[in-house]
């Protein structure tokens, strides 16, 4: 028996599941960013987890092109002491 599809089914499924995930989108593409700046620490902090790890693109929705730039920018900012390596270092 085929699974029910269509708008009605999708809305019902969203209402039933309180943990329904929204479609991810790339923040940098939406903003029209060409290069990610390592000096913009406020933006970079959004992509670092509680334990100091860089959040993967599959969780943030960032495109691969920007994820590579983001990775490099975070590493540069850490090297220049603009960002801490872990959350235990208070800056």
UniProtKB/Swiss-Prot annotation:
InterPro entries: Ribosomal_bS18, Ribosomal_bS18_CS, Ribosomal_bS18_sf. PROSITE patterns: RIBOSOMAL_S18 (PS00057). One of its GO terms (biological process) is translation. One of its GO terms (cellular component) is cytosolic small ribosomal subunit. Keywords: Ribonucleoprotein, Ribosomal protein, RNA-binding, rRNA-binding. The keyword DNA repair does not apply. The keyword RNA-binding applies. Binds as a heterodimer with protein bS6 to the central domain of the 16S rRNA, where it helps stabilize the platform of the 30S subunit. Part of the 30S ribosomal subunit. Forms a tight heterodimer with protein bS6. Belongs to the bacterial ribosomal protein bS18 family. This is Small ribosomal subunit protein bS18. It comes from Burkholderia orbicola (strain MC0-3). The gene is rpsR.
